[in-house]
């Protein structure tokens, strides 16, 4: 029986199969190993992938892109608000949930993701010639519980049995067998993922086959689309210079340039120059322009600077120098860019830069290997050779009340806490109250707390009123998969309540 791994990115999706002791990415019906995560809705059907991307110019208001950015989010979430503002599809809130309004029909982000997962399932089944149900799905390190659950629900709706959600950096290490090739000794690995809409960097300690995440950081202001946009702006300037028309305010013309710039960007990863030709770009005028790799690197110089500064910042955060890193793993389609690879080599001149697996295939391959391990059919010894110690991606906070009855937040699991982990906290509540509600929140960085951050609550009722304070002992245990068990006990009476917050895996 084969197992598969699926990576649903913001801009692309990819499926890999683990069979006969080997993991490999499978091509879709167009012969491409990576599928655009784009869904177009027409009068008669839903179109997924390259065809949807290519037809977007003619069907922009009915074509959904970057659905991953809104999965599991609600209005008021800064990421969701940014997405809604930029989306060409109308996004509305109905019954407390964000949905696309397309041709007077409401379509949830989960339904869009389901169509992409269905495409991945069809792709894998076509390659194998048999049904595939069991899957491991990758998630970004900073995904919250709501986002994980939404992703898992979408995959299940597509007919998948989701065996596990695995963090993307963990999948990257599995793909290269890091920790298995050197079962003894200690090393530090930096996983560098430059995807379509974000840059994620993670430092992982590998010690005798045990993997522990030391630090991670994600920047949503750097990604492949930003390189494409920079090149498209340059092309618009060239068109204005040669044809005397400024098309920057024309969405249709700029979308055509974005498509051309995207193709050119990919070509420049292997070629010294690329041709950008757009038929009838504006007012019947064709556009034809050559861009050299050197020119592209100059146009995107500020983006390249951000890409390397992010590495230095994370190393400083964890107290490392470049010499403390033993290996660098490249992930994400934009990590193919030669200039970026050279800049990373300049930071780590004596470090092995792992890029033998195409960067946009590393993560799904690792997920497929994990799927094979979980099925236990192909190479069960792998499970004994590598143990991941995951860590909490976000701060987990407990909201209670202080002696004066005011809200008070206490960080119990700071982001980066190795899992599994256990914490306990004694909350002091006014003795005049007969019930205490403790709410759990998750946060990244120093963002202000609001209702959008709450993911669970526990209520301790029927407390005996008393002079002084109630002492409520709260014990939280977070497992490796991110699930959280919480118990609250009144120290005076022993009255206890407990909840478990499961994850989609």
Curated annotation (Swiss-Prot):
Q: Which Pfam families match?
A: HSP70
Q: Which GO terms describe its biological process?
A: chaperone cofactor-dependent protein refolding; protein refolding
Task: Return the InterPro entries for the record.
Answer: ATPase_NBD, HSP70_peptide-bd_sf, Hsp_70_fam, HSPA14_NBD
Subcellular location per UniProt equals: Cytoplasm, Cytosol
What GO MF terms are annotated?
ATP binding; ATP hydrolysis activity; ATP-dependent protein folding chaperone; heat shock protein binding; protein folding chaperone
Assigned keywords, A-Z: ATP-binding, Chaperone, Cytoplasm, Nucleotide-binding
Single GO cellular component annotation?
nucleus
Q: Which domain of life is it from?
A: Eukaryota
Q: How does it assemble?
A: Component of ribosome-associated complex (RAC).
What the protein does comes down to: Component of the ribosome-associated complex (RAC), a complex involved in folding or maintaining nascent polypeptides in a folding-competent state.
PANTHER family in the record: HEAT SHOCK PROTEIN 70KDA (PTHR19375)
- Tell me which family the UniProt entry assigns to this protein: Belongs to the heat shock protein 70 family.
State what protein this is by name. Answer: Heat shock 70 kDa protein 14
Species name: Gallus gallus (Chicken)
What is the gene called?
HSPA14
């Amino acid at each position: 029986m084969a197992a598969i791994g699926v990576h649903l990115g913001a801009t692309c999706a990819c499926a890999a199969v683990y069979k006969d002791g080997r993991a490999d990415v499978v091509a879709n019906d167009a012969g491409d190993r990576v599928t655009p995560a784009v869904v177009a809705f027409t009068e008669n059907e839903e179109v997924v992938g390259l065809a949807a991307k290519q037809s977007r110019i003619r069907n922009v208001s009915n074509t959904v892109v970057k659905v991953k950015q809104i999965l599991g989010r609600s209005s008021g979430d800064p990421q969701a608000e940014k997405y809604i503002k930029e989306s060409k599809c109308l996004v509305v809130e109905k019954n407390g949930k964000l949905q696309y309004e397309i041709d007077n029909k409401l379509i949830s982000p989960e339904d869009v993701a389901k169509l992409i997962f269905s495409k991945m399932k069809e792709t894998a089944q076509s390659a194998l010639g048999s049904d595939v149900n069991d899957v491991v799905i990758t998630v970004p390190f900073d995904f919250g519980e709501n986002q994980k659950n939404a992703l898992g629900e979408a995959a299940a709706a597509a007919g998948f049995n989701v065996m596990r959600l695995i963090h993307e950096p963990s999948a990257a290490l599995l793909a290269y067998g890091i920790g298995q090739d050197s079962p003894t000794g200690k090393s530090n690995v930096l996983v560098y993922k430059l995807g379509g809409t974000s840059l994620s960097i993670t430092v992982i300690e590998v010690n005798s086959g045990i993997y522990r995440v030391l630090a991670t950081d994600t920047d949503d202001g750097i990604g492949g689309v930003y390189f494409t946009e920079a090149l498209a702006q340059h092309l618009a300037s060239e068109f204005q210079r040669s044809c005397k028309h400024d098309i920057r305010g024309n969405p249709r013309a700029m979308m055509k340039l974005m498509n051309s710039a995207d193709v050119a960007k990919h070509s420049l990863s292997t070629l010294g120059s690329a041709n950008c030709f757009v038929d009838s770009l504006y007012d019947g005028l064709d556009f034809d322009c050559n861009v050299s790799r050197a020119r592209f690197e100059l146009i995107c110089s500020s983006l390249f600077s951000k890409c390397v500064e992010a590495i230095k910042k994370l190393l400083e955060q964890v107290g490392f120098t470049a010499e403390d890193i033993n290996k660098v793993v490249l992930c994400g389609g934009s990590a193919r860019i030669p200039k970026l690879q050279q800049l990373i080599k300049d930071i780590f001149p004596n470090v092995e830069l792992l890029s033998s697996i195409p960067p946009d295939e590393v993560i799904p391959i690792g997920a497929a290997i994990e799927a094979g391990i979980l099925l236990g059919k192909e190479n069960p010894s792998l499970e004994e050779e590598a143990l991941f110690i995951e860590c909490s991606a976000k701060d987990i906070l407990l909201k209670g009340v202080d002696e004066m009855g005011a809200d008070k937040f206490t960080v119990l699991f700071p982001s980066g806490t190795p899992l599994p982990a256990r914490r306990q906290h004694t909350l002091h509540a006014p003795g005049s109250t007969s019930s205490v509600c403790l709410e759990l929140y998750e946060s990244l960085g120093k963002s202000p707390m609001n209702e959008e951050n709450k993911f669970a609550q526990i209520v301790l009722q029927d407390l005996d009123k008393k002079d002084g304070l109630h002492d409520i002992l709260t014990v939280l245990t977070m497992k490796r998969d991110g699930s959280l068990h919480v118990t609250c006990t009144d120290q005076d009476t022993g009255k206890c309540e407990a909840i478990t917050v499961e994850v989609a895996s």
